[in-house]
């Protein structure tokens, strides 16, 4: 598993499994989402550990991007995980271009949710970038 796209997809699957069962062993989850006898890629652990450790910050940054009256708890679990993963890459993975992070998040939404979710994810992440002052 060498492509960043495949690693990102495995990260989504791992984060979804851990959100569903927070007591799950991460190594067991990685074994489930990776092809058999595959070493855990460093970027996979970076994404999963990063999203989990920064979850409160990510959620705080996502909340203002929602429509008035909406909360994160109203989102579907896949959409929320995709948004967290995309925002993590935008905020903390400096080598990742913002547009590429959004595109990858859209692709995950199309695969694991639907076209409406893909548009929603695009809008939320694009709004975040637009609302964030550039350095």
Swiss-Prot record:
Family in the record: Belongs to the NusB family.
Role, per record: Involved in transcription antitermination. Required for transcription of ribosomal RNA (rRNA) genes. Binds specifically to the boxA antiterminator sequence of the ribosomal RNA (rrn) operons.
The encoding gene: nusB
Species whose genome carries this gene: Lacticaseibacillus paracasei (strain ATCC 334 / BCRC 17002 / CCUG 31169 / CIP 107868 / KCTC 3260 / NRRL B-441) (Lactobacillus paracasei)
One example of a Gene Ontology biological process annotation: transcription antitermination
Keyword set includes Transcription: yes
Superkingdom as given in the UniProt entry: Bacteria
Transmembrane segments: none
Gene Ontology molecular function terms on file: RNA binding
Annotated keywords: RNA-binding, Transcription, Transcription antitermination, Transcription regulation
Listed NCBIfam families: nusB (TIGR01951), PRK00202.1-1 (NF001223)
Name of the protein this chain belongs to: Transcription antitermination protein NusB
GO cellular component, one term: cytosol
UniProt entry tagged with the keyword Cell inner membrane: no
């Amino acid at each position: 598993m060498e492509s960043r796209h495949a690693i990102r997809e495995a990260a989504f699957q791992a984060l979804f499994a851990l959100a569903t069962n927070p007591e799950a062993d991460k190594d067991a989850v990685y074994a489930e989402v990776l092809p058999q006898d595959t070493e855990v890629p460093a970027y996979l652990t970076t994404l999963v550990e990063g999203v989990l450790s920064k979850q409160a910050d990510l959620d705080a940054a996502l909340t203002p991007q929602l429509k008035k009256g909406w909360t994160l708890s109203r989102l579907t679990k896949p959409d929320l995980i995709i948004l967290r993963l995309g925002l993590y890459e935008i905020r903390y993975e400096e080598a990742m271009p913002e547009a590429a992070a959004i595109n990858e998040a859209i692709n995950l939404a199309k695969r694991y949710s639907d076209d409406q979710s893909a548009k929603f994810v695009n809008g939320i992440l694009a709004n975040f970038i637009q609302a964030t002052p550039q350095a």
